[in-house]
Amino acid sequence: MTMTDPIADFLTRLRNANSAYHDEVTLPHSKIKANIAEILKKEGYISDYRTEDARVGKSLVVQLKYGPSRERSIAGLRRVSKPGLRVYAKSTNLPRVLGGLGVAIISTSSGLRTDRQAAREGVGGEVLAYVW
């Protein structure tokens, strides 16, 4: 069965593993998912991620991050632009998540960027997700 929205599946698996206090989550690999995982790592939402070769294909293993008393570092994830309704933002009108405390992941012509990186570079694009 083909997947309609692999990014939403990625975010849902992260959300479910995070709410169940799993240490890591394994999911199908793709370049865009690896790029999103890289952004989440740089922003401090996950500890690490790695690519593993499985029997069928590659898989992406994301290690979730928790605080000293097991508080979650990811409070919420939300898919913004969906296959049925794409959401775009100009460089002058980029979204801010929780007044700058969260991160908007934006697909630009120069790759995936956070809202702050896109504003600094002066580029807009498709708003993929919010993370806080």
Curated annotation (Swiss-Prot):
Any single GO BP term: translation
Keywords, sorted A to Z: Ribonucleoprotein, Ribosomal protein, RNA-binding, rRNA-binding
InterPro entries: Ribosomal_uS8, Ribosomal_uS8_sf
GO MF: rRNA binding; structural constituent of ribosome
Keyword hit for Ribosomal protein: yes
Example of a GO cellular component annotation carried by this entry: ribosome
Described function: One of the primary rRNA binding proteins, it binds directly to 16S rRNA central domain where it helps coordinate assembly of the platform of the 30S subunit.
Record note on quaternary structure: Part of the 30S ribosomal subunit. Contacts proteins S5 and S12.
HAMAP family xref list: Ribosomal_uS8_B
Family to which this protein belongs: Belongs to the universal ribosomal protein uS8 family.
Protein name in the entry: Small ribosomal subunit protein uS8
Organism for this UniProt entry: Mycolicibacterium vanbaalenii (strain DSM 7251 / JCM 13017 / BCRC 16820 / KCTC 9966 / NRRL B-24157 / PYR-1)
